[in-house]
Amino acid sequence: MLKSLCAALAMSVITLTAFGASSAFAEPLKVVASFTVIADFAKNVGGDRVDITTIVGPDGDAHVYEPSPADAVAMAKADIVLVNGLHFEGFLQRLVDASATKASIITLTKGVTPIDFKPEFADADAAEGAGTGDGKTVTDPHAFQSIANARIYVKNIAEAFCAADSDGCVSYQTNAAAYTKKLDALEGEVKAAIQSIPEAKRVVITSHDAFGYFEHEYGLTFLAPQGISTDSEPSAADVAKLVEQVKQDKASAIFVENITNPRLIEQIASETGIKVGGTLYSDALSQPDGPGSTYIDMMHNNIRQIKGAILGS
C-alpha cells in the first residue's frame, strides 16, 4: 500500500512538473511592436515563443498615427514594447502615459549611427518632436532602410527577448543568426542591383524623405517634396522648387509611397514629364497579400521597382 502511494505521488509530481513546464512554454512573451517592420523582425527572432501586437499596421503612417483604446490595452498587458526611437513614433509617449504600462520599452535604434538631415524644403519638416519647420537640421528616424541597421535592430530584439525569457535565449539567438544571414544575402542583391544602374541615372523622387539611410548606404539620390515626416503638406513654393531641381538634376524615375496620398507625386510627374514608376514601401509593410509583406520582400520590391523604372526592365 505504501509502495503504491509513493508511486502515485511520484507520478503526480512528474505530471505536475510536466504541466508546469508546458504551461510556462504555453505563455509566450507578450510583445508590442510600434509598426510593421519591427513586428516582422520580432516574428523572425521570437518565433512561437512570442505573441506580437502591432500598433501601426500594414500601409499605416506612424508619423500621423492616433492611438486607439485597444492600443493602450495592448501596451498595458505587454511584457516588452519594441520601438524605433529617433522620434519616429510621435504618438509613443502619449500611449505610454495612457496605458500606464510596466513593460520594458526597447529602443531598437540603440547602436545605430543616426543621419542628420537638413530639409531642402523648409515647410515640410515639422515631424512631431523631430522637425522644426524652419529648415534646421533634424535626425532622420528611418534607420531601418539600411540593411546594415536592420541587423542592429535584430540584435537588439534578440537581447531584449533573452533578458525577458532566459529559457528561450538559445532559440532567440539561433533565429536571429539565421535571419541575419538572410539579411546579408539581401544586402548583396541590393548592392548588385544598384551597381547595374549607371551613376548618372541614380536620382529618383519619392513622396517624403524616408530613404536617407538607403541613399547613404547604397548610393542612390532621393528627392522629396516632404521632409522626414508626412504630417505637413509642402507649400506651393516647395513643390515649384522641387520641380525645378528635378529638371536640373534630371531625375530618372518618380515613385509614390504606400503610406502617402499619390496626388502630389502625380502632380510633380505631370509637371516634369517623368512617368510614375510604381510604389515604394517606406514606413510600413504591405498587406499580407501584397508585394512587401515582410521586410525582405519590401526591400526586394523597392529595388526591383527602382531598377525597372530607370532601366526599363
Language-model regions, residue ranges each:
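Positively charged n-region of N-terminal signal peptides that target proteins for export
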Residues: 1-4
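Bacterial N-terminal signal peptides
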Residues: 7-20
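Extracytoplasmic metal-acquisition and chelation regions
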Residues: 25-313
